Structures are given as C-alpha cells and as structure tokens.
Amino acid sequence: MRSYSNPENGGQINDNINYSEKRPTMLPENLSLSNYDMDSFLGQFPSDNNMQLPHSTYEQHLQGEQQNPTNPNYFPPEFDENKVDWKQEKPKPDAPSFADNNSFDNVNSSKLTNPSPVQPNIVKSESEPANSKQNEVVEATSVEKAKENVAHESGTPESGGSTSAPKSKKQRLTADQLAYLLREFSKDTNPPPAIREKIGRELNIPERSVTIWFQNRRAKSKLISRRQEEERQRILREQRELDSLNQKVSQAFAHEVLSTSPTSPYVGGIAANRQYANTLLPKPTRKTGNFYMKSGPMQSSMEPCIAESDIPIRQSLSSTYYNSLSPNAVPVSSQRKYSASSYSAIPNAMSVSNQAFDVESPPSSYATPLTGIRMPQPESDLYSYPREVSPSSGGYRMFGHSKPSSYKASGPVRPPNMATGHMRTSSEPTSYDSEFYYFSCTLLVIGLWKRLRASPQDLMCFYSPPKKLFAYLIQFQGIQYRIEYSFFVIESIHVFRVEEPLLNELSATASSRDKPAPNEYWLQMDIQLSVPPVFHMITSEGQGNCTDFTEGNQASEVLLHSLMGRATSMFQMLDRVRRASPELGSVIRLQKGLNPHQFLDPQWANQLPRQPDSSVFDHQGRNPPIQGLSHDTSSEYGNKSQFKRLRSTSTPARQDLAQHLLPPKTNTEGLMHAQSVSPITQAMKSANVLEGSSTRLNSYEPSVSSAYPHHNLALNLDNTQFGELGTSNISYPLSAPSDVGSLPRASNSPSRPVMHPNTQGINTEIKDMAAQFPNSQTGGLTPNSWSMNTNVSVPFTTQNREFGGIGSSSISTTMNAPSQQLSQVPFGDVSLATENSVPSYGFEVPSEESVYAQARTNSSVSAGVAPRLFIQTPSIPLASSAGQDSNLIEKSSSGGVYASQPGASGYLSHDQSGSPFEDVYSPSAGIDFQKLRGQQFSPDMQ
C-alpha cells in the first residue's frame, strides 16, 4: 500500500482501499480525512483538528444512493445509522464443478462466471479487486480418474485387474526343522543376524522366516510363562483363602467352646445354647430348641424347633444323659426347670411321660448321677502341638512340624490327671497353639445321607483334643450347619483302606487338593456313637441349636459315621486323638496290614500308646475282640507285642458306668435265666417290661473297653439261630446289601454270620437263605426262629461276651408282654414279628466259597449302615446322593413299626410328609404312630 500524504486540506486518497470484503471496493475521490485519521494510518497521533470519518454503508456505495457525491459527509435525512445492520453475512459462493481435466485457469476477481461444461473456470468474487494478485493454478486429478485409478489398483473387474491378489503359499516347517529351531531357541531366544542367516542356510529357509519364527516363539514362551504364573498365584490365593477360612472357623469354634454358659449339655461347657460371646458370629434373635428325634410327620429341617421353655435347651433326654455324666458341669445357681417335650433317641430302660425335672437331679428312671467318680472333663493344658499351615496338605499339618526342644518323652511322670486319666511328663508343654484342628475328609456318610467335599465350603471336619470334641462344618446357601459330638460318646473307631468300587468313584470325583499323594491311599474311618450328635445352625439372624438337618434325620437315627480321606491326615488326627484321650485310643481298631508309622514323624510314632490285648479283655470280663477289622490283634496300630498297652496302676480302674445309669433294681422274681444277669436285664425287670413273661434273655453288657457307657438297653436275640444281634459293630457301610459277591473285607469265621443292622427294609424271604444253608449251624434259617411280641428297641450293639458264637448257647427269646405295655416304650422304631415274619435285620453269611449272600427281612430298625456310595454332592439340609431311582441304592423304609400282633398287619410309618424312603410293604401305611402312644394296641387298627 502506498504511503499517504497529509495535505492541510485534509488530503485526498485516489487509490483503491480493500480493507475487507465488507468494505466498498471504490472510495469516492473527495473522501477527506482528518489529521487524526491520517496520523493514525501513519502511526502518529496528532491532537488537533480531529474529524470524524463518514460512515457510508456498503449498500449505499453499491447502489449509488448518495445524492451529493461531492460532499462525502452528506446523507439523506431519513438515514439513521443506528438502524443500520453493520453485521452482514458474506454471500455463499456457488459450488464449483469439475471437468474431466479439472484444471483451473486464472480467474477474475471482479466477476464470477459460470463454469464451462468442458473447461470450467472459477473466477474471483466481485468483492475482490480486478488487479489483485492472481491465484496459483491448482492441478488435481478428477474424481472419475481417481476412482478409475483406485479400481485399477484394487483389481476390480472394471479395470481389468484380478479379483484377489495372488498369495504366496505358506511354508510349513518339517519336524526336523522345528526340532533344530527349538534347539537353537533353547540356546538363545534372540540370536543375532549372523546366527539367523546360518540357521536359514542350514534349514534352507529365508532368513526373514527364521526371524519371524523366533519372534513368535518368544511371544509364545512369554504367554506360557504368564499363564503359569497366573495359575500359581490362583492356587496360592485359594490356599490362603482356605487357610483363612479354617482359621476363622477354628477361632469361632474356640470362642463358642470357651463360652461359660451354665446350660451346657456337654461336659466342660460345650453348650447347646451359649452366651454368644463370639464376635465373629451374629447374635441370635430367637430361641431355638434341640430336638434329636421327632416322632410323627417329618418337619422341615430348615426351621429350628422353637423351645417350650424360656431357655431353649434340654429339650431331649440326651441333655439329661450328658448332665448325668458330669454332675458338676452346671452350678447349683443355674438350676432351672425344663420340660422333656419329645422322645429321646438315647435307649433307656423305660419311658417316662412328659414331666419337669431338675438339671442337677434327673429322675432315677433315666439315670443316676455318679457320686464316687468325677467324669472326664476337657482341659486346656494337656498338650501343645504347634500348628503349621502347609499348602500341600490342604489344611493344618498335625505332626509335620519339628518337635519342641523342651519336650522329653522320658521325663519324670507326674501324678495322673484324675479327671481324664491322662499321664503327662513334667516337661510336656501345657498350652495349645490352637484348640481346633482341621483334617482332610472328602466324603462323609451317615446312613443314607452323604456329603461330598466338592469345595472347601461343602465339608470341613475339625477336632479338638483339649475340648474332646469332633465337629463337621457344612455351609449351604449362606447358612452354616454344624454337627458336634464329644469323645465321650464314641464307642469305637475302625479304620481300613477304601476298596473298589468306591475307590474309583472317589478318585474320579474328589478335587485335586483332596486326592492322596502317589505314595498315599484313601482311608475310611467308621465312628460308632452311643448317642446322636448335637446340631447347630448359624444364619444372619443368629445361631443356636436346631433339628437334625440331614435327610430323613439320618444323623439322629444312624449312629455310625463313615469318613473318607487321605491316609496321612487321618493317621495324624488319630495319633493326636490317642495322645489327648488314651481311653478313646483304646477303642481304635485298624485293618490288618495298615501301617500308620509310614505317614507319621518317626519321633512321634515311637511314642504311640499301646493297645490292649484280647486276653486282657477276656481276663477282665470285657467283650472279646470285635469281628472284622479288629479280630486280628496284631493289626491294632502295628505289632501287638510292640504296642501292647497296659493300664497304669495309678489310673482309676474302669467301671461299668451303665450300672449307674439305670433305675433301681426291684421286682427281680422269676424273670431271667439262671445265668449271669446284667444290670440292663435287672433294669428291664424294674421297669416291668418283662413282667408276666417267661423269657430267657441273651443279656448284653456294654463294652467297657472305652470306660464310657454304651446303650442303656440292648437285647441279643436267639444266637442259636441264623444270626445274633450283638455279633459285631463292623458293618461294611459302603457295601451294597443288594449285591452278592466277594467283599473286600472278610468276616471272622466262615461259619459265623456278620450282623448288619440296616435301615433298608428289603423284602427278601428268609427261605432263600434257608435253602442255601439248610443244615448249617444257623439253626436251619427257619422263618419263625425269632418271636417277639413286645415293643422293644434293639439298637446297634457290640458283641456279647457271654455268648460269643453261634450254637454256643440255646437261649431263646420269647417275650409275651401285655398290649398295654406298648404305651410305655419311648421309641418309635420297633420290630415285631409273627410266625410268618421276622424282625428287620440284614445279614451277610459267608459261605465256603467266600460268597456273601444277603438275607433281608420284612422291616427295619433305626440303627443302620450306608449302602455303596453313589457319587453326587447332596444339598443341605434335605438332599442326599442316594436317590430313589439310583441303581446303587435299594429303596427302603426307615423308622417304622411293623405291626405283627395277631390279626394286625401293615407298616406303621411315622413319616408321611415326603420322606425319600418308600414303604415297600405297607398295606396300612396310613396309621399314625403318634396316635398309638399312650393307647392300647388293637389288632383291628388298620
């Protein structure tokens, strides 16, 4: 732009000024500017003779609306600059069109001409000056040419190209080439170019292919390493979670056991309803009662029974049983009145109607407290075994730790603990690191109810040596269920290896963490109880006792618990239990050939307590060795001569506690045979159960090998016939009664049948067995061999010591009790017989060819064994792996009364509410057993 002069008259500008598109292109010649304006253009700011620049609009200049062009400051009178819209939008130019050559010529800025269809030109807008600088020529390829070029390059058919670019065939490496590359990769994962070229020449492949293979191999190796690390972290995380869960459960159990509630049915404060001092568990919002056994229709196991008393415990007679064992367990200040509102599952000599009684003074008809002997109570200062968590063991290691340096097995012996009979050395530790210990248990079988450990929450088994307690923990749908029982109610423990077909099923179903190691094997432990366990339930609302949550109340009716797990964990648990409770260790029996020492630390295995010999049992008037697994005394925890256990002279002599748990002896005239009369027989006399009957009983005395009471009442029937009730409590819990074939565990003698009380009421005639053994010592197997016409419960018992073998005695049982005595019997599971029927017991009678044939009768008793395992994790509380349609489980009926008085027939079932057990011979299953209590049994009742 030219420089402007500043004449005195204001000066005139004749040049074209193009400030913007909104400014006029041509300014009038007479446009005068003030000195201020000119100085403003020149960058100077004078202070005199200021004049305003006229504001002529763009439209006025274009349209020539100025009437006086000589006077630039003149505008029409009607012009109002305030109403002028100074913001004007730029007109949009027409969209340009492109010709084939798409060439742009120089355009004129004064006019915009329409483009030619052949060679369109884009001219400048009218707002541009005519003599402005010409724009540069932009040459571009037309859209059509661009499309054609792209189509030609992509190989479209229009351009004549191929539809797909040719791909080179992928070269596959041979096995030799791959092996060579793997060897080189093991030497160096990223070789230099010289090595890669050498490899390419050796394998006759391009060096580029070698480079790519090494890259892919490094990526694959990194991926494999990352996955392995993730799997390792996952396993460690799961193990930490399991250990944390075990620790929390142990703490919760310890808090509950340490509760000082005075209303405990167990000795040592193991309460059925505790003061809820446990901070890990919620406080209950309602009172719950503990019912071991419910007669009448089965109730829902999900809902705890509400207690009738203000303190919701002692609702079953088993609480009285426990309190009678330990009179000092409850202080005098806590004496309360409780109501026995249900019949007990504990066998008693007679029934007692509902009445109130004191905890400290139980009625004599139930039990009489001991006065001269204080029963064992758990103590917390017996032993101390440091706990150690091992991921490989799946739980707490019992004896995998190093022995404490202060422990000396040969130290001086202290006076024995009169409460437990335990002898400890002066240098033995006196505190526990943890009171509850976890041991591996993959499968739990109680009767027909099974629980498989598919996850850690499905089944967790604990034991507490200081508290003398076993516990099973089961979690289902957010509810925690627990089964507890004390060491003092364990009659016997039998241990043997798991055989086929259960072995394959367990190996195929168990999780990897629960499977035995290559040098291990599966172990089965059968625990026989004398009373049912205690059941607990913990929900978000609270915790407390509940009813039996197992299907069909199997845990209340069947007192045999079968636990399957790894041998190492089982033997370590048994070793610790034996040390904590020598009396319980004296009833542990091992299968011949089992060697627990290979799974225990030799430093601890050398201190194993010794087992009593069978001669000691016979000499002291106890039961002979139990049949089956324990008939060979050399199999009891090793060699008999090496581990022979002798009772210490400082330990209190064992006593038959059943004598103290029976009613007074009265009216014994003319009731029993001239041979030895047991206290239980005398109790039956005093209860008038046998009043007016001419009966010869094969009496039963509880086994005192464990120094704790067994059943209060048990009868051995005629042992001259094809079976006897008290033969053995080894019951082969996982052998199917319907199978006929060799079993993995043989019985004691080919001529001695093995008794199997069974919950399965299989309708098999006795005449089949009689045809197989017509002239054996079993007495011909006549259907009328047994005849009982009284309502007597026959529980699961041990072998009688007085009448050991079949044919050794001619004592028979013929009991003719009056019908009114039926109302006094407190049991719902009774077996009656007529001339054409027999009581319900299953037998396995071995033949000379070692073939076990089963004889099953027409009813059942509630002391049974489990059939062979049908692997399936059940649900809690009302589910079982033994479905009715299972081909491994025979359909059966449980807990009924076979009415066999003259003129009466039918199966009296007290479970009419969807029980999984089927009444296989139930012509009159509609009779309610509950209505029969307190009433005379009428043959016309159908």
UniProtKB/Swiss-Prot annotation:
Residues 164-224 bind DNA. The gene is phx1. This is Homeobox transcription factor phx1. Trnascription factor that regulates the expression of the homocitrate synthase (HCS) lys4. GO terms for biological process: cell differentiation; positive regulation of glycolytic fermentation to ethanol; regulation of transcription by RNA polymerase II. InterPro entries: HD, Homeobox_DNA-bind_prot, Homeodomain-like_sf. It comes from Schizosaccharomyces pombe (strain 972 / ATCC 24843) (Fission yeast). Residues 142-151 have a biased composition (Basic and acidic residues). It is found in: Nucleus. GO terms for cellular component: chromatin; nucleus. Residues 1-54, 61-80, 87-172, 604-651, 892-922 are annotated as: Disordered. Residues 153-164 have a biased composition (Low complexity). Residues 1-19, 61-73, 99-116, 122-135, 604-614, 630-641 have a biased composition (Polar residues). Keywords: DNA-binding, Homeobox, Nucleus, Transcription, Transcription regulation. The lineage of its organism: Eukaryota, Fungi, Dikarya, Ascomycota, Taphrinomycotina. One of its GO terms (molecular function) is DNA-binding transcription factor activity. It comes from the Eukaryota.
